[in-house]
Structures are given as C-alpha cells and as structure tokens.
C-alpha cells in the first residue's frame, strides 16, 4: 500500500495507492467526508471501501483533501477540493489511460465532490454516493447526470434526512439513458455505525454487477 505524495493545485497531496497488474484494470477514486468535521482518507469507511475496491480488481486511490494530514493548503468550501480530486484523477489517468471502468466513490461531503467530478470527467463510468448531503448542497448541476450509479443512505441519518436523498434520487431517475440504484439501510445513521459491513456488501454487489454487464450497466 504505497504512501505517495502527488502534486496538486494547492501543493502536495497525500495519498494511498494500490495497483493491479493488468494495465486496463478498472480504477476507483475514493473521496472522504468533510475535512472540517474530522473527514480524512483514514476514516474507517473510506479505508474499507478502498480495500474492497482493490479486492474487486480495481487500481484504487484514496487521498486527503487540502489541509488534511500532510496535504497542503486550506479548506476551500468545495471548489479547491474538486480541483484536488481532479488532480488525483489526472495522475491516475496518466498511469492507466485505458481502464475498463472508472469509478468515483464519495462519502457525505466527498459524495458531493464526486458528483461534480463526474460532470467534468467523461471517463468516469460509474459512481457510488454514500450519505450525500442533499439537504445542504445543491445537486442541480446533475442536468443531465452522465452515468449510472448507486446511492446508499441510512433511514436514521441525523445529518441528512432520508427524504431529501429520495427527492434527489427521484429527480435523477427520471432522466433518460442512466439507471440510478438507491439502497436504504434501515436504522443506520450518517456514519453507518454498526452498519459499515452492510454498506461494503451493497457496494460490492453493485460494482460486481455493473462490471459484469455487457453494456456497462448504463
């Protein structure tokens, strides 16, 4: 699990990287929760998602947004963090220009950043959005959403009411050419305490199904 330092728009970016031997292996970028509320690339769900994607055959990277850990810079309310994510994806794409799939997976604040990255990078073929803060951030930029993906949310989320995520899912599901999958975890809070294994299994099942589909699951 190499500890790497990448060049970023605000200076160095601290990251972890696990590769696959196949040059066209699928790749995945994992985005952590809000930096000002304890979010780092070492949060348990980020860490476990990183390893689960690698188990599924992906070259995978997780990293600290600016101002977190050894990443330089300071919190930038999303704009700078999106630039950080784009810089890391640039690095991945330079090393692996022809992946069979390209995933972006984000948790909470990271889900918002991931969906913005999805709009800007046509090479991203699938997304996983876990506990997206649909009550705090505007997702209207997903017009249209360019790829199919998975939303996972807890019914007892104390930060983001499940009804707000349902509205987002309903809006995206009405768009043509994509398929939105939404899984609610009964009793789970925003941090999925005591439910993280269930989240990982849901993501694994979805990713495996998408990558096995002859049409990419779109």
Kindly label every feature range from the protein language model.
Residues 6-96:
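Serine-hydrolase catalytic machinery in alpha/beta-hydrolase-like enzymes
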């Amino acid at each position: 699990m190499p500890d790497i330092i990448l060049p970023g728009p605000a200076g160095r970016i601290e990251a972890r990287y696990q590769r696959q031997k196949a040059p066209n292996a699928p790749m995945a970028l994992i985005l952590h929760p809000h930096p000002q509320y304890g979010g780092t690339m070492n949060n348990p769900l980020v860490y476990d998602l990183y390893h689960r994607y690698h188990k599924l055959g992906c070259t995978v990277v997780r990293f600290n947004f600016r101002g977190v850990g050894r990443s330089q810079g300071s919190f930038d309310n999303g704009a700078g963090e999106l630039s950080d994510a784009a810089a890391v994806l640039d690095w991945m794409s330079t090393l692996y220009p022809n992946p069979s799939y390209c995933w972006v997976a984000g948790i909470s604040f990271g889900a918002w950043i991931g969906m913005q990255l999805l709009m800007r990078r046509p090479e991203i073929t699938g997304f996983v959005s876990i506990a997206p803060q649909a009550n705090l951030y505007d997702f209207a930029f997903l017009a249209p959403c360019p790829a199919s993906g998975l939303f996972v949310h807890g019914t007892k989320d104390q930060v983001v009411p499940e009804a707000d995520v349902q509205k987002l899912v309903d809006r995206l599901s009405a768009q043509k050419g994509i398929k939105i999958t939404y899984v609610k975890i009964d009793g789970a809070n925003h941090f999925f305490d005591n439910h993280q294994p269930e989240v990982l299994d849901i993501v694994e099942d979805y990713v495996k199904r998408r990558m096995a589909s002859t049409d990419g699951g779109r």
